[in-house]
Amino acid sequence: MKILIKNGRIIDPASGTDNVADLLIENGLVTGINKDISREKTEKVIDATGKVVCPGFIDLHVHLREPGFEGKETIESGCKAAAAGGFTSICPMPNTNPAADCLPVIDFIKNTATKVSLIRVLPIAAITKGRKGQELSPMGELAEAGVVGFSDDGDYVSSSSLLLNALLYSRTFDLPIMEHCEDACLAEGGLMNEGLLACRLGLKGITNATEEIAVNRDIALAKESGGRLHLCHISTAGSVELVRQAKAAGIRVSAEVTPHHLTLTEAEVNGYNTSAKVNPPLRTQTDIEALIAGLKDGTIDAIATDHAPHTRNDKLCEFGLAANGISGLETALASLMGLVHSGKLSLSLLIEKLTLGPQQVLGEKYQNIGNLKAGSCADVVIFDPDEEWTVDTAKFFSKGKNTPLEGRKLKGRVKTTIACGQIVYQQA
Amino acid sequence: MTHIPKTPADTETLLSEVQGWKHRHVLDLDNFSREELDMVMQTAGVMLDILSRPVKKVPALKGKTIATLFYEPSTRTRSSFELAAKSLSADVLNLNVSQSSISKGESLLDTLDTLESLGADMVVMRHPLSGAPYLAANNCHANIINAGDGWHAHPSQALLDIFTILRHKSSLEGLKITLIGDIKHSRVAHSNIWGLSKMGAKITLCAPYTLLPEGLNTNSKIFPEVTLETDIKQAVSGADVVMGLRLQRERQQSGLLPGIREYARYFQLNEEILKLAKPNSLVMHPGPVNEDIELSQSVVHGEQSVINEQVKNGVAVRMALFYLCSGSKEI
């Protein structure tokens, strides 16, 4: 099967490409970028005039909820949502039930994804058995089964000695430990960002130190162990600075940030809006500026959605009882394009943080994705950077309709997603 | 200035002056204007008169059902609302739900559905989780009156506090009002900060730093007249009103205080400290008082204490809220 994408603005941060040209896909691989590639013998021609053509996005952090919480999301609905958001590779977190801490669960996830056959699903396994923070999971076996990293996401590994061992042991298999950084004592009972608004709403605040203490400890352990540390969803200016210093000191640390922490502030919580309840909490404009600066200077490697779908009832309750999380796959690009349209981020840097950046966190093994080099996997997204649309969660592929962006007008829309040379999404 | 009617004709005149009420619910005082606070005060004045008549009842809400839904134990507030409803001839349905049953299994919205099916026109609710009345107001038809939610708000208490002060002072404009106690976790304090500052008072908040909302210091745009103070002598000095807050024992358990005795040593309002306030100053407390902890016994029962008046005025203020939210024009 040959697909020819004509006349799009091709942006490939891996090769520094940014020009209007045609892109040819043959047998699931990118085979060429050139001006005026002939239409001959191509089964499918896509006119991408005025559109951006770039590598399919890679999301290091999603929750697919299966097995165990199929009411919130399934591997199938999550993959469809990802495809609609322009993502061609996603890394589901292991906080399923049972937890993805052993071969059978990882195999189940991979087999189900194969049956769904839409996009690449690269599972992350638990650091500890049952995500209980006590004993290491069988990391060697899990690495062999193809997991891309280890995380007890949702919980912090409280024991410093256990995390040190996790970093040392996973280093044996050259896989990252992906930490959810949150000091458990400080976090207890916390519901939103600490500050005047938390006081006004009578909600217990989560201080910046809650995250920064954990980031600091983990960086110290990464230094000591020589292991690979990846920090999930950092949210504060202080965390950005800690990562910046660690990188300058040559410590093997990488970091991701979510679209919501880059675009929304704690003000979304006003009126006890549970769709804006998320952990780490939405912070302040100062933090947003620092996170953007971190993307620009390379401190932050990747943008990851932390797509966290929930049922209606999980959110339609008292703020204190509501589940944490935002369903983010289908609004990620458009909300981030707001930063491009307002001049805060360049389009090529944004694409880099959704493609090359996360690919580098995954490592050399995955260098055939996240770029449009000849011979790379034909994962491609075509989007209109200027099309305006209104978020309507009723039209989400995700079962999770939980987003504070419902009803909001965004600018930038995914038109076509191609994964391994197959068209997996076309905007109606 | 509170207006207490002197004749039945006064009652009608005073009530007819109250126009433009737009609140269906009373959730917090943050969205109340100065004019709306005045409306409550004027209406409560009429209600206080009704309560002092030989027949303490008017038919304003006859045929209406008011439910009280309390997820926290309360005697005073619930009784006050019940009496207020009955004085307006409403039927009252009391529902006490144990705090332990707050779970997603027996949801607040299910319970409210049931109350509405039973015909409740208004629901007075108290809930340990901040914002619960907002969930209720957004998802049901009844008028919701917040009788205290978590650390967030207790609007009727703040309104009765303002009403009580106005029974003794011609205006709140420029008065120094000092609140002492666990400001950070007190819904009474939070609603009072909104209400008192809209009435033009200068507010001083006094507590150790673990119980002080420091965020208030950094955003003077919203509350320009709020001062934080850790020294009780400074805080009380020259005050027109001193309000103690109930110290919850759990604050010690959660590590915010080393102990009750130490708290009393540094933050108890006693006779000696009260002398630093203006001679005609008022001592207030939302009740129930932990005597000899936040207030010394002599201050609770002293001449300047208006704590019992607060209780009495509470019924009138709650009648006013029911009356205004119901849209009734009869009295």
Swiss-Prot record, chain B:
InterPro entries listed in its UniProt record: Asp/Orn_carbamoyltranf_P-bd (IPR006132), Asp/Orn_carbamoylTrfase (IPR006130), Asp/Orn_carbamoylTrfase_sf (IPR036901), Asp_carbamoyltransf (IPR002082), Asp_carbamoyltransf_Asp/Orn-bd (IPR006131)
Record's keyword terms, sorted: Pyrimidine biosynthesis, Transferase
Domain of life of the native organism: Bacteria
Enzyme Commission number(s) from the entry: 2.1.3.2
Gene Ontology BP annotations: 'de novo' pyrimidine nucleobase biosynthetic process; 'de novo' UMP biosynthetic process; amino acid metabolic process
Positions of disulphide bridges: none
Organism: Dehalococcoides mccartyi (strain CBDB1)
Subunit structure, interactors included: Heterododecamer (2C3:3R2) of six catalytic PyrB chains organized as two trimers (C3), and six regulatory PyrI chains organized as three dimers (R2).
Family membership noted in the UniProt record: Belongs to the aspartate/ornithine carbamoyltransferase superfamily. ATCase family.
CC terms in the record's Gene Ontology section: cytosol
Record-listed carbamoyl phosphate binding positions: R76, T77, R126, H154, Q157, G287, P288
Record's keyword annotation contains Cell division: no
Involved pathway(s): Pyrimidine metabolism; UMP biosynthesis via de novo pathway; (S)-dihydroorotate from bicarbonate: step 2/3
Designated name of the protein: Aspartate carbamoyltransferase catalytic subunit
Catalysed reactions, semicolon-separated: carbamoyl phosphate + L-aspartate = N-carbamoyl-L-aspartate + phosphate + H(+)
PROSITE patterns according to UniProt: CARBAMOYLTRANSFERASE
Function, in words: Catalyzes the condensation of carbamoyl phosphate and aspartate to form carbamoyl aspartate and inorganic phosphate, the committed step in the de novo pyrimidine nucleotide biosynthesis pathway.
Any one GO molecular-function label of the UniProt entry: amino acid binding
Binding site for L-aspartate: K104, R187, R246
